[in-house]
Amino acid sequence: MPLWIVKMWHSQLGIDKTEKILAGFKQEKKTYVRCNTAKAPVEEIKRILSQENVSVADVEGIPYALEIKDYDYIAGLKSFRDGLYQIQDISSMTAGYMTGFKAGDTVIDVCAAPGGKSVNAAISVGTDGKVYSRDVSDYKAGLMKKIYQG
């Protein structure tokens, strides 16, 4: 961490908060991915990740979520570039899973950017359902359209 930032935090937040922030940077961050089950079953995605020498673990309670580690650069993985999964925070996946969306449902996501929850909903509702994704920012909505429509 650049010294000037540490000094700024120290002067604005005090030593205790600054130390907590710095300790947070040292903690190992977990990476969670949401499997794109429209492209492949979870077990196949796990097998492919293992072939890419990525360590994979199931996430209890969310059947399409995996924790991955032991990779250098996620965009360097063919499985990622092929769209077999998307990085998504576990809290977002939990929220999506707990809604219980099922085939044929209609979903409105009013705080949609960057789109992970909407994609999760789209996979859950399938081709018989509909997902309407909105965001307060036209810029963010445009990014989602560009990312997900090509």
Predicted regions and their residues:
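S-adenosylmethionine
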Residues: 1-150
